[in-house]
């Protein structure tokens, strides 16, 4: 039986572990934190959508659309889809025109509906400057319920989840991969998969792997209370705002491209300073300023909502390809860096089933 190591216990890493175990592989998952789903997965909006968020990149939109139903079916108990989502196109500041948006909707072939602008006021949304409103039934993932679901499924499988296990280095020994921790060896494996959302310093010493230039974002998402009907709103496509329910709770999560990107760095690995516990304290002024900007945007979008921050700031890290500003492409895919060494590029959580099935078959054929 071949032995696979997966580094990263986010939704992509865990779903792949289940896929491989069901195919007959021995699987170890290594997670540096003490709880599964506590990295990038936990610091995002946890949106699952049907592609409307990506009108400038049809392939990303179609990948989300074709995976939506299977994701909801797979994770039903952790998905809240009991609210309406609204996508607003602005007359000014958008990166696409009304004509381009209409063409995109036709090409995507989703079940989205264009609604009348006058309905915005009934929802408590400021209609000023809005040129188009599209309604779509979508959902969000409840993180606590997703953790419970995975914990239950992992407990009845022969999968070892190694928490508080930071992989410091990877070395190659013939056809095997040797994983090293802080002061001890973690094991030797036939196949290695990186599901670390672009954080790959552990393989920087491998001469067989070429470093890849990525754009890394230090991100801010806020949890807030809003006095509004339970809905989701995304203003597209530019530097606007997204407001979505937080799972099944009575809170909302908000994100805006420019204020939520606290720092941007282009390189071959995540900046070391972001990985220290002191980063948030040292950048408290930056975080507070960005939070204020986000709250002001919420007040502009929902004038009567009385927004109040209700949780600690969610500070995360995301990685995207370089020079993607024109299209905002976020496709998820797999790269084979070397024989039996794979890296998952995770664009959106709703792509995890497609990616894990593809990679499972690929490893099974090797």
Short names for language-model regions:
Residues 2-28:
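N-terminal Rossmann-like FAD-binding beta1-loop-alpha1 element of flavoenzymes
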Residues 45-123, 129:
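Dinucleotide-binding Rossmann-like beta1-alpha1 core, especially the glycine-rich loop
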Residues 299-366:
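C-terminal catalytic lobe of FAD-dependent flavoproteins
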Residues 37, 185-237, 246-250:
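Central helical "cap/lid" subdomain
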Residues 22-42:
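Glycine-rich FAD pyrophosphate-binding loop
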Residues 79-90, 117-157, 338-346:
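Helix-loop-beta segment of a Rossmann-like dinucleotide-binding subdomain
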Residues 134-183, 187, 191, 195-200, ...:
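Helical element adjacent to the flavin cofactor pocket in flavoenzyme catalytic cores
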Residues 261-317:
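Flavin-binding catalytic cores
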């Amino acid at each position: 039986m071949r032995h696979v190591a997966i580094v990263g216990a986010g939704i992509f890493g865990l779903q792949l572990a289940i896929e491989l175990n069901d195919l007959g592989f021995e699987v170890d998952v290594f997670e540096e934190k003490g709880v599964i789903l506590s990295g990038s997965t936990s610091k995002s909006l946890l949106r699952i959508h049907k592609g409307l968020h990506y009108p400038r990149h049809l392939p990303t939109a179609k990948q989300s659309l074709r995976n939506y139903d299977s994701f909801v079916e797979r994770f039903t108990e952790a998905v809240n889809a009991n609210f309406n989502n609204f996508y607003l196109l602005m007359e000014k500041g958008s990166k696409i025109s009304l004509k381009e948006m209409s063409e995109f909707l036709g090409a995507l072939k989703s079940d989205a509906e264009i609604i009348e602008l006058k309905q915005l006021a009934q929802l408590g949304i400021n209609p000023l400057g809005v040129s188009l409103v599209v309604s779509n039934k979508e959902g969000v993932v409840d993180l606590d319920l997703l953790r419970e679901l995975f914990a239950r499924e992992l407990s009845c499988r022969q999968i070892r989840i190694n928490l508080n296990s930071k992989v410091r280095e990877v070395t190659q020994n013939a056809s095997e991969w040797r994983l090293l921790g802080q002061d001890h060896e973690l094991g030797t494996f036939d196949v290695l998969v990186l599901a670390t959302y672009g954080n790959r310093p552990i393989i920087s010493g491998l001469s067989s792997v070429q470093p890849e230039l990525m754009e890394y974002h230090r991100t801010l998402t806020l949890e807030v209370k809003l006095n509004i009907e339970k809905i989701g709103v995304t203003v597209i496509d530019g530097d606007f705002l997204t407001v979505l329910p937080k799972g099944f709770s009575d809170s909302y999560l908000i994100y805006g491209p420019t204020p939520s990107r606290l720092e941007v760095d282009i390189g071959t690995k995540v900046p070391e300073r972001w990985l220290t516990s002191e980063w948030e304290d040292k950048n408290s002024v930056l975080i507070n300023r960005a939070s204020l900007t986000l709250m002001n945007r919420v007040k502009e979008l929902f004038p009567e909502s009385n927004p109040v921050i209700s949780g600690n700031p969610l500070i995360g890290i995301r990685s995207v390809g370089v020079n993607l500003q024109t299209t905002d492409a976020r496709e998820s895919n797999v790269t084979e860096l070397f024989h039996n060494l794979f890296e998952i590029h995770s664009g959106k959580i709703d792509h995890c089933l497609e990616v894990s099935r593809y990679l499972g078959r690929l490893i099974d054929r090797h």
